[in-house]
């Protein structure tokens, strides 16, 4: 049988097999080779016959027939004429599908510039020719001539001449003495004339010679593009088009609408304009029209082609009939609706349905309820085939009829088909991978999908009208993956933090909490029971109560597996809970012999999962769900108004606070404190009062009273709900029954007057009005932040999508150090929690005995973590994604444990995407959750340090003075207090704030919880180091200092004002000096005068002539007033960190260790230099704006990395000064802090994976003898490759320094141009890729989705691996054969080779 006929039944041609895709500029010859004919007419179809016009935009001769196997005039019809070209209408008889593939072309009468290479910044044509875009446009749009060949005239090469100048030059020098041209032809000639090799040599020489930085950068840019053209095989003149390709007609269709009108693609309009203008230009040229007319027509042609390629990039946007801009070729690719994001990365799928979800409490964890109607529709093909197999129908048509009639046998078959065939459920928005899970369907009546209550947390679903989509995996492989990887029973742990996500919530928690309550004095207290039957009998007959304290004999096994029985003090409810616990010696009854809150239950599930495995966990979860629901229903807990108990002491607390606030008001009136300080203190006092009232209320609500018989009363219902974690929080209870507290303005500032009422008492009108502020802000925030958070997730996924586990071990010796994170004296993240599931980088030794506890390259399990905390180790070095040395992807050892499975991570796990989802998902969650506390102000300021351990104090860099009041005061910024225990190990170190009051001294013994130091968080002091008398310098009334008299009190306070703006104030340097008895300025012990510089807004605390002692305060600088912290500030903060933006007031960090010296001021900046300790370093200078407070004095000693001026440090500075490890620690801690404030747990490794992706580039400092250009940014991998090459050739290698890129920039600079183009700035990415002739190796996930393959992660990774091995073996076999052939010229059949074993 003929191959063509075979193709009839299998029309899909075999897919091309390719490993890489290359993009480059199309040459005119290339465009012609694609084309099937030239389009000469702008017509589309004939208005009477509706057939395409010949040589028009839809011409059948060029593009192929309209109907399958039928020519246009109808002479040849049917298959048998396949391949014949009709002599009447010249149409080939073939499939009409070719109209989607065949291209045409338009021959342009005059060349035009390709707008992408002209206008997409930086202009490629401009860079190559070294001309500005303005000049290029003047030439292209026929305003100026350009001299190509000056000849012997005085004109210069590439000089621009206007019309008059051109004519004058012709008159002056004669017509043929020089060559000048205009329009795209001129540019084409210039580009053609470039000799790239010579140009490259010239540029390199020029770069060596130049001194100026700016010029060097400019030359580097040009050199880069010249090299790109040289190596890619593109010719510069191809950026000027002489032929325009026309895309196939079925990709720009003309669709008939009812009513005889047509809807057309915008491209047809754009092509029509090009053809019209081109034809007109041809005609004008034939007619030898005047130059000016031809020029105008050429300009219009250029504009038409520009609009076709990228409408609106230059000049006005071309609009259609309805004033809507026409969609050009570039718009087809760009944006959310473009080809990349709409059709290649996101496709609509068949076999799917959606419906509302309802709760299905009787389902098992792996099941979902699917409405029969839906299932029938979704599984239709399977039902047809089964009907056919059973002989119930002979044709598909018959089967269809049976199904439509819903005959009884169809339902039986549906049951069979559905059995063990998982379906996927998805709830939008799918923020992380748990948003799509597989379930086994059970058929139900009705039209709503039933969902298991425990998976709601993963989907973030509730039943207030949410909808979910169902998808059917069709192929066997898909079903297998759904069952093995995506089944809800396989997703028990959260990929972000490794804690269980199948956790009971709401009613279930309440029921379990109620079940585990123990109350005193109930009937039957102290009775002893031997087994469950006795217990149930006693319960039912009312001898004991569910909450009675009893003794019960519990059977369990000891360490050796021997059964033992022990008597346990417990309650009947807890025993019932114990019955569902899996039997294992690792899990004791004590796990549940306590009050079960949500957190406790989560802990138990975690234990069960770790010790008993997945199956047991799933059964356990289902059982406690049933138990919880049943007991919540039995308990009948309700919510009454008397359950909201307003504490007795409330008004007393309110009155004292009111008095305090009044007192602060008075102090302000007396001029003792500033307005800012008063505000801070008042806000502070009220937030303390709110806390106090909340505490009182909690105390009253949580206590249970006993009646005359000693029977303990039932616990308060509201307290039960909040305490168990079922619903509500202490913050909400506080607003119900305590006092609502402080409210925030939309700007984030706190309103000074709090809301004293609570919701039970009711708010006054004024209070209500005040509270609307915060509530409205919350709602507005929610709407805005959801979009922001989604965009953050998208950027994160894009930057990390090609991060995949590709090997087991990269063998690196590098790692990062981990220690516990302590904030305000409390441990917020213990060392154990941070290193769990990570790999040890070096042997971990016991500090006391020096024996090896854990060997290097061990994956830390829970047991190892316990060992470490027992040994009191404070710091552990672990492997990290940041230090992994693999070229592509990350190795399993550096990544550690797969958090969602609790086992070492598998090959092919897409850890980048998981990291991105783990960071992005809570962003959206939190933004949706801002308004829950109604904007009630949550203020947190740290101002004390307390010891966490018992031990002895040692102080490093000690400088303490006893001030005039007899207190000890810290006099330096780098003073560190350490607590050392009896063994001499440092248990904790605290950095002490400048000016803090010390409560301890060197060698003191402290107890746990004892205060070490405290300070005022709202002001920063300027202290004196010497005893003496005060003198002022440059503190001139009205110029640099303003004395404000408080009218009501008559007390003056003096503030330093901005002196730069005042007349004659530019040279002032306001300062306080300390004078000795002789009236001269004293010298400081470390050299320099005792002169203390003041910054703007400093408040003076002393007068001229006052006597001071060391440690006394000379002036105070107020820090900004307390703003509420809320993830609203948090999300932008996370984005700012990931984008590696420089903060507004960036801190200035010392690059070297040395001594501070003040230099001469420069304009209105202070000059500070650091004289290095190390003689080989050079002195560093910093210019600091005058108003900034510099808290260093002349002669202070700073360490490398110390802050000279406070603020948020710029991440780039940290990288440059302290290196990668410090930068990673900074970013991880800052990002974690934002999430921690909201109580969200994210494992550090996710953030590390993203930071690794931000550090992929190297900036070249010295190019050595390589082809790299100093100053350019290049991929680390490429950098290493070129250096290796240079080393092998014995040349000098290049040196570079790592650079930090923000996630957007990093995404746009990935090695794959497909991935970058589908992310943002499509035009720019594609232009650059084409110029460079880039090759996309198709390594990441996105590129493979775009070209329609399996992604190289998960099962796709193993397929890729197998393919790789196969290719290697084939190559080996071929090499062997070639060798054999070379040895034996004409040997008989050689014996079969021994193949290498398959991996």
From Swiss-Prot:
Its EC number is 2.7.7.6. The RNAP catalytic core consists of 2 alpha, 1 beta, 1 beta' and 1 omega subunit. When a sigma factor is associated with the core the holoenzyme is formed, which can initiate transcription. Binds 1 Mg(2+) ion per subunit. Binds 2 Zn(2+) ions per subunit. The gene is rpoC. It is an enzyme of class 2 (transferase). Disulfide bonds: none annotated. DNA-dependent RNA polymerase catalyzes the transcription of DNA into RNA using the four ribonucleoside triphosphates as substrates. It comes from Nitrobacter winogradskyi (strain ATCC 25391 / DSM 10237 / CIP 104748 / NCIMB 11846 / Nb-255). It comes from the Bacteria. This is DNA-directed RNA polymerase subunit beta'. Belongs to the RNA polymerase beta' chain family. GO terms for biological process: DNA-templated transcription. The keyword Cell membrane does not apply. The keyword Transcription applies. It catalyses: RNA(n) + a ribonucleoside 5'-triphosphate = RNA(n+1) + diphosphate. GO terms for cellular component: DNA-directed RNA polymerase complex. One of its GO terms (molecular function) is DNA binding. Keywords: DNA-directed RNA polymerase, Magnesium, Metal-binding, Nucleotidyltransferase, Transcription, Transferase, Zinc. SMART domains: RPOLA_N (SM00663). Coiled coil: none annotated. Zn(2+) 1 binds at residues 71, 73, 86, 89.
């Amino acid at each position: 049988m003929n191959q063509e006929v075979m193709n009839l039944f299998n029309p899909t041609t075999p897919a091309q097999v390719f490993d890489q895709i290359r993009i480059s500029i199309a040459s005119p010859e290339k465009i012609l080779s694609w084309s099937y004919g030239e389009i000469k007419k702008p017509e589309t179809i004939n208005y009477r016959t509706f057939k395409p016009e010949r040589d028009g935009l839809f011409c059948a001769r060029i593009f192929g027939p309209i109907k399958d196997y039928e020519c246009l005039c109808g002479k040849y019809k049917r298959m048998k004429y396949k391949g014949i070209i009709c002599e009447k209408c010249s149409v080939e008889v073939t499939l009409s599908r070719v109209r989607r593939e065949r291209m045409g072309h338009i021959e342009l009468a005059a060349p035009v510039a390709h707008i992408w290479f002209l206008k997409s910044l930086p202009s490629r044509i401009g860079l190559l020719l070294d001309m500005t875009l303005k000049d290029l446009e003047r030439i292209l749009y026929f305003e100026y001539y350009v001299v190509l060949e000056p000849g012997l005239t005085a004109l210069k090469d590439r000089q621009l001449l206007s019309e008059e100048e051109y004519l004058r030059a012709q008159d002056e020098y004669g017509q043929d003495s020089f060559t000048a041209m205009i329009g795209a032809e001129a540019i084409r000639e210039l580009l053609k004339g470039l000799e790239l090799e010579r140009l490259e040599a010239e540029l390199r020489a020029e770069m060596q010679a130049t001194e100026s930085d700016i010029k060097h950068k400019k030359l580097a840019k040009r050199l880069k593009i010249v090299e790109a053209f040289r190596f890619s095989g593109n010719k510069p003149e191809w950026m000027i088009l002489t032929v325009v390709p026309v895309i196939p007609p079925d990709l720009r269709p003309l669709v008939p609408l009812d009513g005889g009108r047509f809807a057309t693609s915008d491209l047809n309009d754009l092509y029509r304009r090009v053809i019209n203008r081109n034809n007109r230009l041809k005609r004008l040229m034939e007619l030898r029209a005047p130059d000016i007319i031809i020029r105008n027509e050429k300009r219009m042609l250029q504009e038409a082609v520009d609009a076709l390629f990228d409408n609106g990039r230059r000049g006005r946007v071309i609009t259609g009939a309805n004033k809507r801009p026409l969609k050009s070729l570039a718009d087809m690719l760009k944006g959310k609706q473009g080809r990349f994001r709409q059709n290649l990365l996101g496709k609509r799928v068949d076999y799917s349905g959606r419906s509302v979800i309802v709760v299905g409490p009787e389902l098992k964890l792996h099941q979902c309820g699917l409405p029969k109607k839906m299932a029938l529709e979704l599984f239709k093909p399977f039902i047809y085939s089964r009907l056919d197999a059973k002989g119930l129908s002979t044709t598909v048509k018959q089967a269809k009829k049976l199904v439509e009639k819903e005959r009884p046998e169809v339902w039986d078959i549906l049951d069979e088909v559905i059995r063990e065939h998982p379906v996927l459920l998805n709830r939008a928005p799918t923020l992380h991978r748990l948003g799509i899970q597989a379930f086994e369907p059970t058929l139900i009546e009705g039209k709503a999908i039933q969902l298991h209550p425990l998976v709601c947390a993963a989907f973030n679903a509730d039943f207030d009208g949410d909808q979910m989509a169902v998808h059917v995996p069709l192929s066997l492989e898909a079903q297998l993956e759904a069952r093995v990887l995506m089944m809800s029973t396989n997703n028990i742990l959260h990929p972000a933090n490794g804690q269980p996500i199948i956790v009971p919530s709401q009613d279930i928690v309440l029921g379990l909490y109620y079940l585990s309550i123990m109350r005193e004095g109930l009937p039957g207290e102290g009775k002893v029971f031997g087994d469950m039957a006795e217990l149930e009998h006693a319960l039912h007959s009312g001898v004991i109560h569910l909450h009675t304290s009893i003794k019960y004999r519990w059977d369990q096994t000891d360490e050796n597996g021997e059964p033992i029985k022990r008597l346990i003090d417990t309650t009947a409810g807890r025993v019932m809970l114990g019955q569902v616990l899996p039997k294992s010696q690792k899990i004791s009854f004590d796990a549940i012999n306590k009050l079960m809150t949500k957190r406790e239950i989560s802990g138990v599930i975690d234990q069960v999962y770790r010790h008993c495995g997945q199956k047991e966990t799933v059964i356990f979860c289902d059982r406690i769900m049933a138990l919880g629901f049943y007991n919540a229903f039995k308990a009948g807990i309700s919510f009454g108004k008397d359950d909201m108990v307003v504490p007795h002491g409330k008004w007393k607390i309110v009155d004292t606070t009111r008095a305090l606030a009044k007192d602060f008001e008075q102090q302000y009136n007396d001029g003792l404190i500033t307005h800012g300080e008063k505000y801070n203190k008042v806000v502070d006092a009220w937030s303390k009062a709110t806390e106090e009232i909340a505490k009182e209320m909690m105390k009253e609500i949580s206590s249970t009273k006993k009646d005359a018989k000693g029977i303990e009363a039932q616990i308060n219902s509201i307290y039960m709900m909040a305490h168990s974690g079922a619903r509500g929080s202490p913050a909400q209870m506080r607003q119900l029954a305590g006092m609502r507290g402080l409210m925030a303005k939309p700007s984030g500032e706190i309103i000074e007057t709090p809301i004293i009422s609570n919701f039970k008492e009711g708010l006054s009108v004024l209070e209500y009005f005040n509270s609307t502020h915060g509530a409205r802000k919350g709602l507005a925030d929610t709407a805005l932040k959801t979009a922001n958070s989604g965009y953050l997730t998208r950027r994160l996924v894009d930057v990390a999508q090609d991060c995949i586990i590709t090997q087991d071990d990269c063998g690196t010796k590098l790692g990062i150090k981990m220690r516990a994170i302590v904030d305000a004296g409390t441990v917020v993240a213990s060392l154990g929690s941070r290193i769990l599931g990570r790999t040890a980088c070096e042997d971990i030794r016991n500090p006391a005995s020096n024996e090896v506890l854990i060997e290097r390259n061990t994956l830390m399990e829970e047991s190892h973590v316990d060992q470490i905390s027992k040994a009191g180790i404070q710091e552990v070095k672990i492997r990290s994604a940041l230090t992994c040395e693999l070229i592509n992807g990350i190795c399993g050892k550096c990544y550690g444990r797969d958090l969602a499975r609790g086992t070492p991570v598998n090959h092919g796990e897409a850890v980048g995407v998981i990291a991105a989802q783990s960071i992005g998902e809570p962003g959206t969650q939190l933004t949706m959750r801002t308004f829950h506390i109604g904007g009630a102000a949550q203020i947190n300021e740290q101002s004390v340090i307390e010891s966490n351990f018992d031990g002895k104090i040692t102080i490093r860099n000690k400088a303490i003075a006893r001030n005039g009041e007899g207190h000890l005061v810290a006099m330096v910024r780098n003073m560190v207090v350490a607590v050392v225990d009896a063994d001499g190990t440092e248990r904790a170190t605290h950095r002490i704030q400048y000016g803090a009051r010390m409560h301890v001294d060197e060698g003191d013994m402290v107890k746990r919880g004892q205060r070490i130091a405290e300070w005022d968080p709202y002001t920063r002091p300027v202290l004196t180091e010497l005893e003496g008398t005060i003198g002022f310098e440059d503190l001139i009334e009205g110029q640099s200092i303003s004395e404000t008299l408080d009218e009501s009190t008559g007390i003056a306070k003096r503030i330093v004002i901005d002196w730069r703006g005042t007349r004659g104030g530019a040279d002032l340097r306001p300062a306080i000096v300390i004078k000795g008895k002789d009236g001269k300025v004293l010298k400081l012990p470390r050299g320099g005068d005792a002169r203390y510089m003041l910054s703007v807004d400093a408040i003076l605390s002393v007068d001229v002539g006052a006597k001071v002692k060391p440690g006394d305060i000379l002036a105070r600088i107020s820090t900004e007033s307390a703003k509420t912290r809320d993830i609203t500030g948090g999300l932008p903060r996370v984005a700012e960190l990931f984008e590696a933006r420089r903060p507004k007031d960036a801190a200035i960090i010392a690059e070297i260790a040395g001594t501070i010296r003040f230099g001469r001021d420069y304009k209105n900046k202070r000059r500070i230099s650091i004289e290095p300790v190390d003689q080989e370093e050079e002195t560093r200078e910093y210019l600091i704006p005058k108003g900034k407070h510099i808290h260093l004095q002349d002669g202070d000693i700073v360490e490398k990395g110390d802050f000279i001026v406070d603020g948020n440090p710029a991440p780039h500075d940290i990288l440059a000064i302290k290196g990668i490890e410090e930068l990673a620690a900074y970013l991880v801690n800052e990002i974690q802090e934002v999430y921690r404030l909201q109580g969200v747990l994210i494992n550090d490794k996710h953030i590390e994976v993203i930071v690794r992706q931000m550090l992929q580039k190297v900036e070249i400092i010295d190019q050595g003898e390589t082809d790299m250009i100093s100053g350019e940014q290049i991929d680390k991998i490429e950098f290493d490759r070129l250096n290796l090459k240079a080393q092998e050739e014995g040349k000098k290698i290049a040196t570079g320094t790592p650079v930090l890129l923000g996630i957007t920039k990093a995404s746009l600079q990935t090695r794959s141009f497909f991935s970058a183009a589908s992310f943002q700035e499509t035009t720019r990415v594609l232009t650059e890729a084409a110029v460079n002739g880039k090759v996309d190796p198709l390594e990441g996930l996105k590129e493979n989705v775009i070209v329609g393959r399996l992604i190289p992660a998960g099962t796709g990774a193993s397929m890729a691996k197998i393919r790789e091995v196969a290719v290697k073996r084939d190559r080996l076999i071929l090499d062997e054969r070639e060798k054999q052939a070379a040895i034996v010229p004409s040997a008989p059949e050689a014996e079969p080779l021994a193949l290498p074993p398959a991996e």
